[in-house]
């Protein structure tokens, strides 16, 4: 089935939130969607994001931290910004691109429980999207 839609998760550094969103997206949406993530900048995958996803048996050690790819951005069926900075400075998307904002707190530099909380919130949001389309 190569008629998959494309979903593109964006945040500032493609380090924490968008990495977790990509992983959850592949788990919940992978049969119907091509799932990608990127950042305004590429800060590298945060080790605590890797650890947090490992706790829920999802391995993201092979995911890479990437800057926004205009080719993916301009052909995505859905672009999801995960932080207000990415929402405001994201390159403009063509009018036919569906772009939504799902805001999540940035756990970087915060205590471990913040990574767990944000991981779970992102997972629940993507699970809801997989079930309802919203």
Curated annotation (Swiss-Prot):
GO cellular component, one term: cytoplasm
Subcellular compartments: Cytoplasm
EC annotation from Swiss-Prot or TrEMBL: 1.20.4.4
Oxidoreductase listed as a keyword: yes
Main location: cytoplasm
Family: Belongs to the low molecular weight phosphotyrosine protein phosphatase family. Thioredoxin-coupled ArsC subfamily.
Protein name: Arsenate reductase 2
Organism: Bacillus cereus (strain ATCC 10987 / NRS 248)
């Amino acid at each position: 089935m190569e008629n998959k839609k494309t979903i593109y998760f964006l945040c500032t550094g493609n380090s924490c939130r968008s990495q977790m969103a990509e992983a959850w997206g592949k788990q919940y949406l992978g049969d119907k969607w091509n799932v990608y993530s990127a950042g305004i900048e590429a800060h590298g995958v945060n080790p605590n994001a890797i650890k947090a996803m490992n706790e829920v048996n999802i391995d993201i050690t092979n995911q890479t931290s990437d800057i926004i790819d205009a080719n993916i951005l301009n052909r995505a069926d859905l672009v999801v910004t995960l932080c207000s900075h990415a929402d405001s400075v994201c390159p403009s998307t063509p009018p036919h691109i569906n772009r939504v904002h799902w805001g999540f707190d940035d756990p970087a530099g915060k205590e471990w429980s913040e990574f767990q909380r944000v991981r779970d919130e992102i997972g629940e949001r993507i699970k809801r999207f997989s079930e309802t389309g919203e």
